[in-house]
Design a protein with these regions (language model features):
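His/Glu-rich zincin catalytic helix
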Residues: 1-85
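Acidic/histidine-enriched segments that form metal/cofactor-coordinating
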Residues: 77, 82-184
Length: 184
């Protein structure tokens, strides 16, 4: 695709619509204009979640296996850089990981372009050191312990584990303490 393809999709019932943009790189972008809002939100979502633990590259014959919890680990780490922690700079940032998606978001009332460029930069240029990886492993380990205090969460993953003996959906989105310790 040499040019961006822009389509406006309108919902007659709601009386509003959005733009669907197919960027020449293949990235899909959705813009929902809301003139009455004073805040602007941006979400960068990718089709990469907790079940994506096995990959095959086009230049290799074998599969690459990564530890359970890697998508969630990256969700935590991608808001950091050597110079900047996005959570310290912006009041409203967030991220989430599901079985098949990871999303990064921010809200601002000004400087949208600068904020958006920073979000894209965090995703495109991750920052890792041995120290920050170890620190995050500890934080996620505590998060895993916290999930164990939730009967609903434990029930869900006990059920998934009983239903799916081999599929990665049976493993907690955050991984296990063992699997996150394998992330280097």
């Amino acid at each position: 695709m040499s040019e961006n393809k822009i389509t406006y999709i309108e919902n007659a019932v709601l009386g509003e619509g959005y733009y669907s943009i197919e960027h020449k790189s293949g990235l899909r972008i959705f813009v929902y204009p809301k003139e009455e809002y004073t805040s602007t939100y941006a979400v960068f979502g990718t089709k990469y979640g907790s079940i994506d633990t096995r990959f095959k590259r086009s230049d290799r014959a074998d599969f690459i296996e990564i530890p359970a919890g890697t998508a969630h680990f990256l969700e935590h780490k991608l808001f950091e850089s050597e110079e900047l922690d996005a959570f310290q700079r912006y009041a409203k940032t967030g991220a989430s990981t599901s079985f098949d998606r990871t999303c990064y978001l921010f809200m601002c009332t000004g400087n949208f372009k600068e904020n958006f460029e920073i979000l894209i930069d965090f995703v495109r240029h991750p920052y890792f050191t041995e120290e920050t990886v170890r620190k995050e492993q500890g934080i996620i380990g505590q998060e895993i312990d916290m999930y164990k205090d939730s009967p609903e969460w434990e029930c869900l993953f006990n059920m998934l584990s009983a239903m799916y003996h081999k599929h990665p959906v049976r493993i907690d989105i955050a991984g296990t303490k063992q699997s996150i310790s394998e992330i280097t």
